């Protein structure tokens, strides 16, 4: 849930076209005689959020419910919440935009792509191509990659001067944090991004982005519903929320793809 916690969250009416400027405002210098132009400026780009339902449902027999009601109730909500957050995080990157949020990898507005050969992937010079693509205004972003990609390919990498650029930091509480080329790294599971070893040619193996440039819109916060299905002697529980998500600003997002060995 670390990625879901970092993306921007709003609550606006679905179906309404929202100018990007409203989601990513800019400040302007003014004088006593001249007010800011934003009063008459119009944004060329906009996003529209839809109504997509996400639910996690489970049932148990009435007999089992009598025996384990409190235990089941205590477990269901956190388990359902975890499952729904995981589904949203997968959609943030791989969502098709049809019946679910539009993911970063599927958004045609994300055009910055760097392809690394195996030799480049394993070297500072190769990843320096990615750093050179980072725009100044967006350099406070983070890398997103598979845990295996970081552990086997990035951790311990050195620059041309022998200085480590990929490393694992261990906090006083034992929690691991990852850094690469001066940027934070968020590691994900295989269902979000494949590892370098498992990826096919042309697959995205890493993303550089500022998480606040992706917006999650909820029209109905997570609700828990419980009812009895007397025909089947089942007690049913479900968590339900209405959510959509889209990239608000694609200018700072970079996709890193797997290439083939240069000949």
What positions do the PLM features span?
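Extended oligomerization regions of viral-like shell subunits
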Residues: 12, 103-235, 239-241, 263
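Short, charged, low-complexity patches
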Residues: 69-77, 81
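Short, glycine/acidic-rich hinge or "gate" loops at secondary-structure transitions
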Residues: 90-105
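Assembly/oligomerization interface modules of large self-assembling protein complexes
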Residues: 1-56
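Protruding loop/beta-arch "assembly-hinge" segments enriched in small, turn-prone residues
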Residues: 3, 7-10, 26-27, 225-263
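Extended, low-charge hydrophobic alpha-helical regions
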Residues: 48-66, 157
């Amino acid at each position: 849930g670390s990625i879901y916690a970092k993306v921007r969250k709003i609550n606006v009416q679905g179906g309404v076209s929202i100018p990007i400027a409203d989601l990513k405002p800019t400040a302007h210098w003014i004088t006593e005689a001249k007010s800011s132009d934003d009063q008459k400026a119009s944004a060329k780009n906009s996003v529209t959020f839809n109504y997509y339902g996400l639910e996690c449902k489970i049932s148990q027999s009435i007999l089992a419910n009598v025996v384990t009601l409190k235990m089941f109730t205590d477990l269901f909500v956190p388990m359902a919440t975890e499952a729904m957050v995981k589904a949203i995080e997968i959609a943030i990157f791989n969502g098709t935009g049809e019946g679910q949020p539009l993911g970063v990898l599927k958004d045609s507005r994300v055009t910055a792509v760097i392809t690394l050969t195996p030799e480049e992937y394993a070297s500072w010079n190769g990843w320096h191509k990615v750093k050179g693509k980072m725009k100044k205004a967006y350099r406070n972003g983070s890398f997103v990659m598979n845990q295996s990609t970081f552990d086997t390919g990035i951790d311990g990498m050195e620059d041309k001067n022998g200085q480590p650029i990929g490393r694992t930091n261990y906090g006083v509480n034992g929690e691991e944090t990852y850094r690469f080329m001066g940027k934070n790294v968020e590691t994900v599971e295989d269902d979000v991004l494949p590892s370098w070893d498992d990826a096919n040619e042309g697959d995205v193996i890493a993303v550089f982005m500022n998480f606040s440039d992706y917006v999650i819109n909820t029209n109905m916060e997570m609700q828990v519903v419980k009812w009895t299905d007397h025909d089947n002697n089942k007690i049913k529980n479900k968590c339900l929320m209405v959510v959509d998500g889209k990239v608000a600003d694609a200018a700072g997002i970079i996709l890193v793809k797997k290439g083939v060995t240069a000949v």
